[in-house]
Amino acid sequence: MTTINGGTVFDFTQRNRPVSKSVIIEDLNDFSSIHYLGSGAKGVSSSNPYKRIVFVLSGQLECTNRTTGHTWTCPEGSFTIFPGNCTTGFSAAEDTVALRIVVVNPTEIYSILEDEKAYDLKQLVPEQEDSSVFIHILSCGNTKIWAVTMVEGKFFEAETLNSNMVYMCLEGEVKITYQDKERILHENQCFYCLKDNGIHLQAGASPTRLLIMKDIL
């Protein structure tokens, strides 16, 4: 399993280098992993009862439901849901990095989301003047995922977190204060915050969009 220290700024897309026609898998925990697909890579996921939600962090993923023959494209900055109980295929014409979460016994998936469609994370949450907007994408055991849009100057904070959290900047920039130190996150960068710590986030541009992920590490 991957070990990332709390208080670390990192970029999932830079942790491994994709290899041509190959897939490198970095396990984050029992249910989530990063997949590094080199150009020309192809693969098949055998049928299992669980849905899988896949976030394409760079590149582009070509997806196939091999049971029905349906195909769809998931470009960089988007995500898709693979249905359970079917065999799925995927390929990448260019180097591609994706975060995959196996959805075991979900308690909630955002109601508008359908299987086998690509959703642009930057368009999922509308920008609202003088507001921060949160959409709860997924709850699955301890894992929870939110998409957030903030306008410049807006902030939110937690005095004490009860779980480990990853904050990923999708657009704009965000200033993070953690353990009395400030960091600036830019697009594609992540910050790992350990439970029992407080955190303060402030948007440095309009719009600033984040993906917040609980207990994926």
What are these language model-derived features?
Residues 41-43, 62, 78-80, 84-90, ...:
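Histidine-centered metal-chelating micro-motifs
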Residues 26, 42-48, 65, 72, ...:
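Short histidine-centered beta-strand/loop micro-motifs
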Residues 37-39, 56, 74, 82, ...:
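Hydrophobic residues in beta-strands and at strand termini
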Residues 48-63, 150-151, 160-175:
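Short, conserved beta-strand element in jelly-roll/cupin
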Residues 67-84, 179-196:
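Short acidic-glycine-tyrosine-enriched beta hairpin
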Residues 84-109, 195-217:
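Ligand-binding loop in jelly-roll beta-barrel domains
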Residues 1-38, 42-44, 71-76, 80, ...:
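A short, N-terminal "cap"/entry segment at the start of jelly-roll beta-barrel domains
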